[in-house]
């Protein structure tokens, strides 16, 4: 069975660019001009797969946060979508990324209220393993 914390750390390492694993991210980016990339272990769904086997769907969210203007948004949207596509079919920590979802792609509220781009892509990794119980 895959450890979701190790998976999140592997995703952050693969992204590079200062990406960091956090468990309760909340940012006010006043005075911060550089982009922040945050990786959060988001959930695990387990179901029976085949006789004596289980399928885990491990979900990791990648957030890009940056103080910006509306003119910066298209490039930031392309970047968050690109992160998701880059992980599809990629193996990290022994599991394969089977899905990347941006829904919504970014938070219009954060853009209006904070002048901050907050975009999230949720990566779903699949693991099939023997039920050891």
Residue spans of the language-model regions?
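Charged, amphipathic alpha-helical segments and their flanking helix caps
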Residues: 1-27, 42-133
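A short, hydrophobic beta-strand-centered structural micro-motif
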Residues: 32-43
């Amino acid at each position: 069975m895959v450890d979701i914390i190790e998976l999140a750390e592997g995703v952050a390492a693969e992204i590079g660019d200062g990406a960091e694993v956090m468990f309760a991210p909340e940012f006010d980016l006043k005075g911060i001009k550089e982009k922040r990339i945050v990786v959060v272990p988001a959930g695990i769904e387990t179901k029976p797969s085949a006789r004596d086997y289980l399928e885990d769907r491990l979900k990791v969210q990648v957030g890009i946060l940056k103080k910006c203007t509306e003119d910066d948004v298209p490039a930031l949207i392309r970047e968050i979508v690109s992160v998701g596509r880059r992980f599809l079919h990629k193996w990290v920590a022994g599991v394969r990324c089977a899905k990347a979802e941006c829904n919504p792609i970014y938070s219009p509220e954060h853009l209006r209220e904070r002048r901050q781009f907050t975009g999230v892509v949720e990566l779903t990794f699949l693991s099939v393993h023997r039920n050891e119980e």
